[in-house]
Curated annotation (Swiss-Prot):
InterPro entries, sorted: AKR, AKR2_Oxidoreductase, NADP_OxRdtase_dom, NADP_OxRdtase_dom_sf
UniProt protein name: Uncharacterized oxidoreductase YqkF
Pfam families from the UniProt entry: Aldo_ket_red
Claim: Nucleotidyltransferase is one of the keywords in the record: no
Known EC number: 1.-.-.-
Superkingdom to which the source organism belongs: Bacteria
Residues that coordinate or bind NADP(+): 197-207
Amino acid sequence: MRKRKLGTSDLDISEVGLGCMSLGTEKNKALSILDEAIELGINYLDTADLYDRGRNEEIVGDAIQNRRHDIILATKAGNRWDDGSEGWYWDPSKAYIKEAVKKSLTRLKTDYIDLYQLHGGTIEDNIDETIEAFEELKQEGVIRYYGISSIRPNVIKEYVKKSNIVSIMMQFSLFDRRPEEWLPLLEEHQISVVARGPVAKGLLTEKPLDQASESMKQNGYLSYSFEELTNARKAMEEVAPDLSMTEKSLQYLLAQPAVASVITGASKIEQLRENIQAANARRLTEEEIKALQSHTKQDIYKAHRS
C-alpha cells in the first residue's frame, strides 16, 4: 500500500484509510475486518467518539493493541451526547474537547492520538478557543496533530488562516466535486484533504444503478437527478475501460495532489479487499482525468460562504 505525507506532519498514511464507522458493534466481525485491513497495508484508521456512542473507539482500541506504533490513529470530537436521550448537541468548547479527549484515550486504550479532528463546526463557534484547546493538547503530548472535518467554506477559511491544522476531511467524489474549489488554497498551505464518501453511497461502484433505492431514484444525489446519474455513470464506464468503476473513483481522488488518503468503509471483508485493490490500481492519465471530469459537475458549496 502506497503512503502519503499528511500535510506538514511527519505522519505517512496509507492512500486508503479505513472508515471505522461502518464496522458495526459485533466485535468479532469488526475485529476481523480491522485485522485484515492492517494485514493488507492500511495503517490509517478513522473513528470518532460519536460512532455507536463510543463503542466504535473501544473496538478500534482492542484491534490496535500490541501494534499501536504501526497505526496512524484518527478520531474526532465536538458532538456531545445529551444525557438521558439518544441525541447529541454541538459543543466545541475548550472544556468539552479536553474532557472528550480523555474519554477517547480510555476507550482507545492508548496514551496519544495521532490526528484529533473537530467533528464539524460553524462560523458562530468560538474558533480561537477551539484552536487553543487543540494547541494545548499538542503541547501536553496527548495528540500529535489536529485537523477538522468540515465542508463549510467559511469555517475552512478561518481554520486555514488561524490554525495549524494538517488536514481537512471532506466528502469528495466524482459525483461531489465541490471540494475542488479549495484544493489550490489547501495545496498552498500544505494542508491535506482526507476524502470521505469516495463512491457516493455506492453510485460509483460496480453495483447496477437500477438496484438503487427508491429514494435515490426519486430524489437523485446532490444536484444530480437519477437520470443524470445514470447517464454520467454510463459515460464514465467507457473511460479507462480496463479499470472498474470503484478503481476509477478512488484513482480520480488520488490524482489530486492535495489528497493524502481516501477513507472507505467496509462492513464485509470483500468490500475491504475491493477498496484496497482500487487503491493499488494503475494511475489515471491526464486525458482520462479530463474525460471523467467532462461527464460530471463541478459544483460549489453555496451556503456558509461568509
